[in-house]
C-alpha cells in the first residue's frame, strides 16, 4: 500500500502547458489557475467535496478556443489520480453520490476499475458558454471523458433534474468529487478485485 498518495504531472504541447499536483489524502484545498474562471470554480468544488488537495496551472490557446485547455487539464488530472492511487490496495473502489444544488439534482457512480469509461445522461446544455473568458458547456463532458480515459475510472453521471446550466454543471463536479472521494478511501487490506489487480493494461 502506498504510504503517500501524491502525484505530479506535466504536459506541454504546442497548444497548452499544464501542471497538476494531487494529494489523495488531503483536506480538499485547491489552487487552480486555468485562465477560465468558471472552470477554476468547478475544479475547486471537485477538490473540496472529494477531499483531494489539488494544484493546477494551465496556459492554453484560449484565443482559439477553450477545448485544448479543458481537455489537457482532464488528461493531466486523470494521469495524476491514476499515479497517486498506486497499487489500489485497500481502497473502497466503488462509490456513488447524489447531490442537489437548488433545482438541479445530479447522481454520480464511479468504479476505480482500471477500465476507463464515461457516461453522461440527462444533460443537454441550454447555454453555449459560461463565464469570461468562457467555458464552453459542450466541453464539460469532454473534460470528464478525458479524465476517465487517463485515470482508469468508470464513471456514470445522471442529471436527474435541472433548469440552470450553472447549477447542473456545478452539481456534477460536486457529485463526482464526493463519489471519487469515497471510492479512493482506504477501508481495508488487499486489492478489491477477484483478479488481484486494478491497474490498467
UniProtKB/Swiss-Prot annotation:
InterPro entries for the chain: IGPD_sf, ImidazoleglycerolP_deHydtase, ImidazoleglycerP_deHydtase_CS, Ribosomal_Su5_D2-typ_SF
Listed GO CC annotations: cytoplasm
Keywords of the record: Amino-acid biosynthesis, Cytoplasm, Histidine biosynthesis, Lyase
Top-rank EC class of the record's enzyme: lyase
Subcellular location: Cytoplasm
EC number(s) given by UniProt: 4.2.1.19
GO molecular-function terms, A-Z: imidazoleglycerol-phosphate dehydratase activity
Family: Belongs to the imidazoleglycerol-phosphate dehydratase family.
Protein name: Imidazoleglycerol-phosphate dehydratase
Organism ancestry: Archaea, Methanobacteriati, Methanobacteriota, Methanomada group, Methanopyri
Amino acid at each position: 500500500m502506498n504510504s503517500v498518495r501524491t502525484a505530479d504531472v506535466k504536459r506541454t504541447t504546442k497548444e497548452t502547458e499544464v501542471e497538476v499536483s494531487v494529494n489523495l489524502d488531503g483536506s480538499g484545498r485547491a489552487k487552480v489557475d486555468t485562465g477560465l474562471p468558471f472552470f477554476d470554480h468547478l475544479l475547486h468544488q471537485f477538490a473540496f467535496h472529494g477531499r483531494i488537495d489539488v494544484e493546477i496551472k494551465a496556459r492554453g490557446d484560449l484565443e482559439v478556443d477553450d477545448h485544448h485547455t479543458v481537455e489537457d487539464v482532464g488528461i493531466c488530472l486523470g494521469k495524476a489520480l491514476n499515479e497517486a492511487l498506486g497499487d489500489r490496495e485497500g481502497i473502497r473502489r466503488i462509490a456513488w453520490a447524489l447531490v442537489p444544488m437548488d433545482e438541479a439534482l445530479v447522481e454520480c457512480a464511479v468504479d476505480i476499475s482500471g477500465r476507463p469509461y464515461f457516461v453522461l445522461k440527462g444533460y443537454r446544455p441550454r447555454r453555449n458558454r459560461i463565464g469570461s473568458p468562457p467555458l464552453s458547456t459542450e466541453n464539460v463532458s469532454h473534460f470528464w471523458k478525458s479524465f476517465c480515459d487517463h485515470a482508469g475510472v468508470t464513471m456514470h453521471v445522471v442529471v436527474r433534474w435541472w433548469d440552470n446550466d450553472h447549477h447542473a454543471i456545478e452539481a456534477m463536479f460536486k457529485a463526482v468529487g464526493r463519489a471519487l472521494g469515497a471510492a479512493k478511501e482506504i477501508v481495508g487490506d488487499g486489492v478489491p478485485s477477484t483478479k488481484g489487480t486494478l491497474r490498467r493494461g
